[in-house]
Regions:
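Active-site/ligand-binding-proximal alpha/beta "capping" segment
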Residues: 111
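Hydrophobic alpha-helical bundle architecture
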Residues: 200-204
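Membrane-interfacial, low-structure loops and terminal tails that flank and connect transmembrane helices
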Residues: 9-20, 151-170
Length: 264
């Protein structure tokens, strides 16, 4: 939908004016967000714990944060509304799909006593928000690369560059709060670990990969020191590849590497 809208000179799409299409998409997103909020609230009430105790609930939470960020950004940046809304649908839909794969257990159970801490709930919530924001930078990068390839095939190099630059700007808008929340989430997690386990950092696989993820994305905050990343093309390639660190941090650690965080 986004690619067709950005590469077509027509003002209408699917026979609808842009304003009507945007309104319908926002309405659908708000309805989806409300249903997911209701579902998470029910799990919270039934279990008497914030729904972040296992992989299934954390995926639902990432989808919830993706929808929330999308709704806020859609109203804040009207000129990019279609792009932002579509990204939100793609991300939240992907996370909801992943939550229903065979490895995820949707059963509501009792939380481990050591995990029943307000600090842990804050830590996981902030980390999930950062993952949602960084996933949006990944979608920006992937979309920019696809659009650039399409415009190159059509011989519209200048148009492709303009679109890539706009997506780079949007990606950096997501990047700064993502890095802030990721750093804050790791910091709060270290405090909770010291209270629960007696040490701030134990080089557990997830701790190590969370630090690697933070360092990989921190490179994007220093564009003045890395001239190549000032170019939209290389910036988007970097953000697309960098997302693999999040995939390893979440899925690789949980289902392959193990460790104390394998329950999360």
């Amino acid at each position: 939908l986004v690619i067709r809208r950005l590469t077509s000179s027509k003002t209408q799409l699917l026979g609808l004016r842009p304003s009507i299409l945007h309104g319908l998409l926002i309405l659908l997103l708000v309805i989806s967000f409300s249903v997911l909020t209701f579902a998470l609230a029910l799990r919270w009430i039934i279990s008497d714990n914030i729904p972040l105790s296992n992989g299934y609930e954390s995926m639902l939470s990432v989808a919830w944060f993706s929808m929330l960020i999308t709704i806020v950004m859609a109203f804040a940046m009207r000129s990019l509304r279609l792009l932002i809304i579509t990204f939100g649908f793609l991300l939240s839909g992907f996370f909801l799909l992943v939550s229903h794969i065979g490895q995820m257990d949707p059963a509501i159970g009792h939380i481990m006593p050591v995990l029943n801490s307000p600090l842990l709930s804050i830590h996981v919530s902030i980390i999930m928000m950062s993952y949602a924001l960084l996933a949006l930078t990944f979608i920006c990068g992937l979309t920019a690369l696809i659009l650039s390839a399409l415009q190159r095939m059509r011989g519209c190099l200048q148009t492709g560059l303009e679109q890539s630059t706009a997506l780079m700007t949007l990606s950096r808008i997501f990047l700064y709060p993502a890095m802030t929340t990721l750093g804050l989430g790791i910091f709060i997690g270290a405090i909770w670990a010291n209270i629960s386990w007696g040490n701030y950092w134990s080089w557990d696989p997830k701790e190590t990969w969370a630090l690697i993820t933070f360092m990989v994305y921190a490179v994007l905050l220093h564009l003045q020191s890395v001239p190549a990343l000032r170019t939209p093309k290389y910036y988007h390639i970097y953000t697309t590849i960098a997302f693999l660190t999040i995939v390893i941090t979440y899925f690789g650690v949980n289902y392959v590497l193990g460790g104390m965080h394998s329950y999360a």
